[in-house]
Structure formats: C-alpha cells, structure tokens
Amino acid sequence: MTAPSQVLKIRRPDDWHLHLRDGDMLKTVVPYSSEIYARAIVMPNLAPPVTTVDAAIAYRQRILAAVPAGHNFTPLMTCYLTDSLDPDELERGFQQGVFTAAKLYPANATTNSSHGVTSTAAIMPVLERMEKIGMPLLVHGEVTHADIDIFDREARFIDTVMEPLRKQLPGLKVVFEHITTKDAADYVREGNDQLAATITPQHLMFNRNHMLVGGIRPHLYCLPILKRNVHQQALRELVASGFERVFLGTDSAPHARHRKEASCGCAGCFNAPTALGSYATVFEEMNALQHLEAFCSLNGPKFYGLPVNDSFIELERRESQVPDNIALNDDSLIPFLAGETIHWSVKK
C-alpha cells in the first residue's frame, strides 16, 4: 500500500544566498529559483564583479529577463566589496533600493573572489558607512592564509576577523553566511540581534565522510568545505531548535559538469532544484517540521526588515527521483542529489 501523502502549507520562502551566474548559465538556472522563491539575495561574484550601482541595475535586468512568464520573483542585489570601493557609491545604491546588502569576500576565498577584501581595515570607511545607514554586511567567513588548514578557516575567522569587527562596529548588521561549524553555530546563537546566519542544505545533510569515503564526490565539494559529523550535528540542532536568527540560504552555485568533474574541480553545489525538499527532510528527521516555515519564510525578512511574502506554497511528502543532469548548451549541470530519491517536493 502507498502511504497517504502529507502536505505542508508554508508562506512562500526566500533564498538569502544565491548564485545565478550570467549568460547562458543564468538563463538555465533562474527558473529553478524563481519558480519556488519570491526573493533571493543574488551574489555579486561575476567576472568582473558587481561593484557599482549601474552594474547592479544591468545585472538585475538580465536576471528579470530570464524569469519565465508566470513566475513572480524579485532579485535582491548585492555589492561586491573591494579595497577601493567608494562609500558614496555604496550608499547611493542602498538609498535608491538597488543594493539590499554588501558582500565581503576575503580575497581568493571562493569562486571569482580575487578582487575581494585584503583586510577589514582596508575597507573600514565603507563598513562605518554601512553601520551608519543600516546596510547589512554579508560575510564569507573564512581566512585565506596559506598556512591555515582548510577545515579550520571558518573557526579561525571568528576569532581573528568577525569578533574584532563586531566589537569595533557594534551597530553593523552582519549575516554570517553558509556556516559550517559548531564554532559558528555557537557564535551566532550567543550573539546579539545584529548577527544572523544562513545554512545550506548540503551542510545540514552531509559531512566530509559523505564526500570522501568510498570515492570522491565532486558534486558535494563546496566552500566552505563540508566538516566533521560533530559540526553537521551542531548545525542540525541549531535549525531544529527554532532559533530565529538563522534562515534559508541555499548558496546554490552552478558549474558546468566538466568544471566539477575535473582534475582541479570547482567548488559549489547546484541545489536550487532540490534545496527546499532537502530542508524539509532535515527538519522532519529532527522532529522539527513546526519550525520549517520560520526558517524558510519568516526569519530572513525579520532580520532584513522586509515584509513577509503574501503567497503560500505547498510541500508534499511523496517520493520522486532527481534528474541525473540538466541540459546546458553542449554540457550539463548535475543537480544536488542527482539520481537519488527524495521525499519532499513542491506541489505543482
């Protein structure tokens, strides 16, 4: 017998950390997000990065042009912080409603981050202006010194960058993005209402054993890298507790298959097609489905000072299979959980 399906109705969610890329990749991946999410914080790490108001407006138009008819989707644009960024340009974009937030990438921490910030001291006038105008700072929280082990880079960032910065600018709103460690979970939980975090589905579902034992799985390779089981469990416990300053941020980061399955493969999981069902699975496993809506749809708007969405979606508990690949010109994209059976899907 087939068990009766379970349906969860939740307010329409937002994705507070999303990579849409550009060109043909943009046109391919946008519908997977615009179908489900009402809004998304769009990352600015293009080549060249989005560092001006005009560049953000142009990129927003390219995104909107890729949204299928019938989808209601608002991209929330971000400014890529560099050592040479003009605080006046940043403020102009924020006051005009072009920039929702600004993104701090430590130089060379992740994809297309070579233009990133060399030190917070180098951009202190920009950060002081952000504190003054109430503009959120989104942080990729890893140090990038060559002598720091890749598994330690997030924890080290808290001690050497994040905590000193928040002490120096106590009024600055900070989102600690895609946290991956118990250290970060504890830090955010113990922080004040100026500090929040996003968590990806892959960091809730998997740890480094899943990526490395029995063969290397390049489609689980992302940055920050998957950590030990103890860190995965800390993240799961944080979201299952109903903690209000943590919210959905998929960090969906598409790369063509040949760039993932390579001798020097790219970091990033393309999880937009399966993320929401993945989150539901985790919350169900943790007996915390009562907190799923807040994580997906309420906590983010509250932190950003934005209204919650008026519309609703339904998640259905039924088994379905994730496609093995998604066509991309003469290549393909491998979605997160490709070929696997998933238990929650958005009801069409």
Swiss-Prot record:
Belongs to the metallo-dependent hydrolases superfamily. DHOase family. Class II DHOase subfamily. This is Dihydroorotase. GO terms for molecular function: dihydroorotase activity; zinc ion binding. The gene is pyrC. HAMAP family: PyrC_classII. The keyword Hydrolase applies. Its EC number is 3.5.2.3. Pathway: Pyrimidine metabolism; UMP biosynthesis via de novo pathway; (S)-dihydroorotate from bicarbonate: step 3/3. It is an enzyme of class 3 (hydrolase). Keywords: Hydrolase, Metal-binding, Pyrimidine biosynthesis, Zinc.
